[in-house]
Amino acid sequence: MMRYALGVEYDGSEFLGWQQLGEMGPSVQATLQQALASVADSSVRVVCAGRTDAGVHGQCQVVHFDSAVTRPPRAWILGTTTRLPSSVAVRWCVPTSEDFHARFSACARRYRYRLLNRQVRPALQHQFLSWERHPLDAQAMHVAAQMLLGENDFSAFRSAQCQALHARRELQAISVRRDAEVIEICVQANAFLHHMVRNIVGSLLMVGTGERPMEWIAELLAGRDRTMAGPTASARGLVFVGPLYPEKWHLPMEVSV
């Protein structure tokens, strides 16, 4: 058996999320597995670096799969992509060792959240942009966000459905910046809780509108109470930029936050 690593890009708008959930609806995982199985002429199961929710996009999701069939990387890339809908594409393929694991070999994961901050909702690229009509203070949001850095208990920002055994995560980097009418929030951590990024964004938006002071974010973190934090931000503005791996795996992780 040969193990392969793939870099996958997808528009999550029409999917119920990454994970295959029986017959409930289309998932990125099931769609990719079906295309790979056609190339391999046998069933294929993929394991991803990080599962995304319904409506969340993937810029460079990394997966691994095992196959008894030997194909050159180009054949896996082109053969699979031609069998995928236009909303999913394989960016690269690297043969790797059986020690590599898309999830457990990753040392960090990165997300990007983008929203349009103007009076009128977006018509172009609306599936990739959230929207906030009230003026936002991006600098205040950025300063408040720095209070989340480090290893902390992020219970205030996890969903009620989160199945993680504990809420401690290491937030390694977070930034909020404005480019004209678009505000971009970039986050990197060793791992994330369910809805963690969207819940952080929802709370930062309340700081941005002036509803809450910057210090409120630190109070939420210390309080560990989800009911005291802001609402969960829309999924449509969220992109899983991708995972980071140690250099020994030689994966083409050229995507930067």
From Swiss-Prot:
Transmembrane segments annotated in the record for this chain: none
Keywords recorded for this protein, A-Z? Isomerase, tRNA processing
Could you name the active-site residues? Answer: 53 (nucleophile)
Stated EC number for the protein is: 5.4.99.12
User: Which top class of enzyme applies to this chain?
Assistant: isomerase
- For this chain's UniProt record, which GO biological process terms are given? tRNA pseudouridine synthesis
Query: Which Gene3D superfamilies does the entry link to?
Result: Pseudouridine synthase I, catalytic domain, C-terminal subdomain, Pseudouridine synthase I, catalytic domain, N-terminal subdomain
For molecular function, the Gene Ontology terms on record are:
RNA binding; tRNA pseudouridine(38-40) synthase activity
Q: Which residues bind substrate?
A: 111
- The question of whether Isomerase is a record keyword is answered with yes
**Origin superkingdom:** Bacteria
Xref: Pfam families: PseudoU_synth_1
Q: Which InterPro entries match?
A: PsdUridine_synth_cat_dom_sf (IPR020103), PsdUridine_synth_TruA (IPR001406), PsdUridine_synth_TruA_a/b_dom (IPR020097), PsdUridine_synth_TruA_C (IPR020095), TruA/RsuA/RluB/E/F_N (IPR020094)
What's its catalytic activity?
Answer: uridine(38/39/40) in tRNA = pseudouridine(38/39/40) in tRNA
Q: Which family does it belong to?
A: Belongs to the tRNA pseudouridine synthase TruA family.
This protein's assembly is summarised as: Homodimer.
Per the entry, what this protein does is:
Formation of pseudouridine at positions 38, 39 and 40 in the anticodon stem and loop of transfer RNAs.
Mind telling me which NCBIfam families this protein's record contains?
hisT_truA
**Name used for this protein in its record:** tRNA pseudouridine synthase A
Question: From which organism does this entry originate?
Answer: Xylella fastidiosa (strain Temecula1 / ATCC 700964)
